[in-house]
């Protein structure tokens, strides 16, 4: 029977003096081949339970730790993916980041999360162009409403998945919710409960452009407005100009509050509010409360998100 050789963890040396235990050390100490030791550590291969248990005891005693960098290099992968979003301040994008991280962990991946300056020279196009495949195996890109990507921007030589209601020119895998149908359902929910004069908080469409919404195929705001418009048209419900102010690209709580006040100040009667995201809905609710308007007794409110 071979005598166990002392390692740094057994000699009382300081951490800086400790010798890193290698897979070869484990194999020699256990009296097995490198392949067998590797199979035990990676939970693969066929061997007797006794052999597997013997090797595992050596692993535990020597304090062997997998060299992740070396393993990933051998496998031709980094073990990381990149998630790129316009910002992390909105609940939707923060929630997206959390879900991506949770799912990646199941597959033994870590996630680099980065933001980009949408609509600038350091926007998504720059990020795609300068992606470093030596530190990340691919990218999940949350598409910006403020930046139009060309086919050339999206023609990359690494795995790319785009998220959001923008056209990707069939150059990348693409995940997006059905904004039109979802907005229709939200609007119909209010109409089914007696709302006949709906207001909309979050529109980026001028009133004169409403008739063109049926042709819209991208953009969260435009697609959601299309769903609202179609649902109202089906019920012969008119949308008043004063009840759907153009908020631009600001879908924050503050914007919801300010634009709800604009609607109230217009003096045009309304009995329902369709907010195109939940932050706008929260802002609208605070303004309604500040004006003494009861929800849902006087005005019913619905938001769009989870």
Residue ranges with predicted function:
Residues 68-69, 123-127, 148-150, 255, ...:
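Short acidic active-site motifs
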């Amino acid at each position: 029977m071979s005598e166990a050789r002392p390692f740094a963890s057994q000699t009382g040396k300081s951490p800086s003096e400790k010798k890193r235990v290698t897979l070869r050390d484990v194999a020699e100490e256990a009296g097995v081949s490198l392949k067998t030791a590797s199979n035990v550590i990676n939970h693969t291969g066929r061997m007797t339970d006794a052999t597997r248990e013997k090797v595992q005891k050596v692993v535990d005693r020597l304090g062997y730790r997998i060299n992740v960098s070396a393993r990933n290099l051998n496998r031709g992968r980094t073990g990381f993916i990149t998630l790129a979003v316009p910002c992390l301040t909105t609940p939707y994008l923060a929630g997206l980041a959390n879900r991506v991280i949770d799912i990646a962990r199941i597959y033994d991946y870590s996630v680099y999360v980065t933001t980009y300056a949408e609509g600038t020279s350091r926007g998504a196009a720059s990020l795609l162009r300068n992606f470093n495949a030596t530190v990340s195996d691919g990218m999940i890109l949350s598409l910006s409403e403020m930046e139009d990507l060309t086919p050339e921007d999206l023609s990359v030589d690494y795995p790319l998945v785009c998220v959001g209601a923008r056209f990707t020119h069939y150059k990348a895998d693409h995940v997006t919710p059905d904004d039109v149908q979802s907005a229709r359902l939200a609007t119909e929910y209010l109409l089914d409960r007696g709302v006949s004069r709906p207001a909309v908080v979050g529109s980026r469409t001028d009133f004169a452009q409403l008739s063109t919404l049926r042709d819209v195929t991208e953009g969260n705001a435009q697609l959601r407005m299309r769903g609202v418009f179609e649902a109202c048209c089906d019920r012969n419900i008119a949308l008043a100009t004063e009840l759907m102010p153009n908020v631009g690209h600001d879908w924050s709580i503050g914007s919801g509050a300010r634009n709800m006040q604009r609607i109230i100040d217009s003096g045009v009667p309304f009995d329902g509010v369709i907010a195109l995201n939940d932050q706008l809905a929260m802002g609208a609710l605070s303004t309604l409360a500040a004006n003494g308007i009861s929800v849902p007794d006087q005005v019913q409110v619905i938001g769009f998100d989870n």
